[in-house]
């Protein structure tokens, strides 16, 4: 018997002046202590980005929860997403955290900043395998879960925070990792951790975000 249970929380802020968020998080529980979490970032911002990210996260989470392969998910997304008339591409990133029986996590990443994992209150440099599926470079990791592991997935609006204001080149992933590592010992909930991260991004943007920013913590 496995006594681990997952705590999931996420928070987004919109690009300044936009009513809709171009990032989307979808969570699907499959009833056997397995959960699919997808964070997607649609190209650009506003309505089009929102549609792209919502479709992407819904398609992936639903198909994976039904037991279909990652290859089938990626092919379905490529065939389904509306193509941008200006740039000629249908583009949306994704980070997938697939918890299986609350024992292992499959982490699948396409074009988002690499997820941060904190284990034993320290940043853990976890193994990754590079794959190509449907012409997309995808990173996959299979991780045996331990108690108090923390996964932090984010859209690129997080490391872009502070560009040209607080930092010349944004709030880099390593800086975000250090920030999250400093919070780990306090035992905050996933929702609180994701909120603290995104609130810090909002502050670095001067409360006028230049991009949608989303953090999802598991």
Region roles according to the model:
Residues 1-20:
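Regulatory cytosolic signal-relay segments
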Residues 41-42, 112, 150-157, 212:
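DG-centered beta-turn motif at the end of beta-strands
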Residues 51-121, 138-139, 186-218:
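Catalytic core of PPM/PP2C metal-dependent serine/threonine phosphatase domains
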Residues 3-6, 31-34, 101-104, 146-148:
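Beta-strand-turn-beta hairpins that frame and shape the catalytic cleft
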Residues 18-31, 125-163:
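Acidic loop->beta-strand submotif enriched in PP2C/PPM serine/threonine phosphatases
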Residues 160-200, 204:
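Juxtadomain coupling helices with adjacent low-complexity linkers
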Residues 117-127, 168:
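A short alpha->loop->secondary-structure connector
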Residues 24-80, 144, 152, 164-177:
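Primarily the active-site beta-strand->alpha-helix module of PP2C/PPM metal-dependent phosphatases
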């Amino acid at each position: 018997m496995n006594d681990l249970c997952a705590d999931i929380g996420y928070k987004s802020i919109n690009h300044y002046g936009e009513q809709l968020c171009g990032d989307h998080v979808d969570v699907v529980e499959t009833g056997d202590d397995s959960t699919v979490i997808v964070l997607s970032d649609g190209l650009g911002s506003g309505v089009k980005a929102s549609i792209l990210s919502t479709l992407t996260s819904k398609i992936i989470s639903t198909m994976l929860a039904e037991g279909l392969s990652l290859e089938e998910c990626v092919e379905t997304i490529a065939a389904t997403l509306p193509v941008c008339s200006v740039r000629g591409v249908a583009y949306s990133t994704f980070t997938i955290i697939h918890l299986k029986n609350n024992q292992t996590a499959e982490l699948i990443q396409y074009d988002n900043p690499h997820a941060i994992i904190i284990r034993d209150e320290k940043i853990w440099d976890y193994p990754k395998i590079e794959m190509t599926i449907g012409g997309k470079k995808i990173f996959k990791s299979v991780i045996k879960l331990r108690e108090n592991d923390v996964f932090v997935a984010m859209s690129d609006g997080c490391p872009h925070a502070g560009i040209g204001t607080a930092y010349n080149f944004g709030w880099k992933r390593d800086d975000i990792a250090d920030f999250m590592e400093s919070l780990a010992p306090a035992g905050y909930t996933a929702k609180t951790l994701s909120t603290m991260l995104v609130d810090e991004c909002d502050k670095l943007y001067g409360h006028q975000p230049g991009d949608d920013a989303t953090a999802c913590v598991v």
